[in-house]
Amino acid sequence: METLNVSNVSLTYPGLYSDQAVIALKGVNLEIKSGDFVVALGASGCGKTTLLNLMAGFMAPSDGEIMLGDRRITGPGADRGVVFQKHALLPWLNVIDNTEFGLKLRGVDKATRRDLATRNLALVGLQDFHRHMIYHLSGGMQQRVGIARALTCDPAMLLMDEPMAALDALTRETIQELLLEVWQLTNKMFFFITHSVEEALFLGSRLIVMSPRPGRITHTYELDFNKRFLENGNARAIKSSRDFIDMREEILGIIYGDELQSGNPELLHA
């Protein structure tokens, strides 16, 4: 069973002058095991995406280290799949060619990569869209292709940076439910960033709340709303339950504090 360990990680962005350095993260510790669905919440600029980029190997910490199993993360790798807010698919390739693209780069033979891509497209409900071009798909379907592409390389971990931020509400709920089914079937590690408290509560088996810069993990919650959904399939009932609503209000209060008390309508519907 794989484990990702973030150990006392800090990141400082140097400024033009020494007094202009920006401390993005400070002393972050986090453990994620196979089967964990960890969701990160926090106000804009708190370092959520920076932490994900460090896990992905897109950048290196100023202090501390990140280990995946016994391997120190020093760059991107096939053991971590990334799904971005924008799908990052190749528009000149069709759905199945996009899905198997990572395996092709690794030199996997065509029959094997086609089989893996076919299975993962079926997993996200796109078994009938192999030959469709990316620009013919809706935003939700494009994100499904992105998820299938990440899964096809069989990573130990999926890193997802607000993958549903640009989707309409109905599509967003559909993809949320799909993600939980994928999580249940694959038992992979998930690290998911969102600005929606409702989405975080529904998806996560663990929720971390990060402070404004310098980003630190200030609160951790163990959750089971996702398992309740997988047992009964009624997302609306879960999201309207008293304990779900109470938890939502508590976390909104932590993140936004006085702003929430002022009645800002954007926050009240977060």
From Swiss-Prot:
| Binding-site residues for ATP, renumbered to this chain | 42-49
SUPFAM superfamilies to which the protein is assigned, alphabetical = P-loop containing nucleoside triphosphate hydrolases
Q: Which UniProt keywords apply?
A: ATP-binding, Cell inner membrane, Cell membrane, Membrane, Nucleotide-binding, Plasmid, Translocase, Transport
Q: Return the broad EC class.
A: translocase
Q: Where in the cell is it found?
A: Cell inner membrane
State the EC number(s). Answer: 7.6.2.7
Where is the major localization of this protein?
membrane
Membrane-related topology note: Peripheral membrane protein
Q: Which GO terms describe its cellular component?
A: plasma membrane
Q: Which reaction is catalysed here?
A: taurine(out) + ATP + H2O = taurine(in) + ADP + phosphate + H(+)
Listed GO molecular functions?
A: ABC-type taurine transporter transporter activity; ATP binding; ATP hydrolysis activity
| PROSITE patterns associated with the record | ABC_TRANSPORTER_1 (PS00211), ABC_TRANSPORTER_2 (PS50893), TAUB (PS51250)
Pfam families associated with the record: ABC_tran
Where does the ABC transporter domain lie? 4-237
For this chain, the family text in UniProt reads:
Belongs to the ABC transporter superfamily. Taurine importer (TC 3.A.1.17.1) family.
The role this protein plays is:
Part of the ABC transporter complex TauABC involved in taurine import. Responsible for energy coupling to the transport system.
Q: How does it assemble?
A: The complex is composed of two ATP-binding proteins (TauB), two transmembrane proteins (TauC) and a solute-binding protein (TauA).
Q: What is this protein called?
A: Taurine import ATP-binding protein TauB
Record the organism: Rhizobium meliloti (strain 1021)
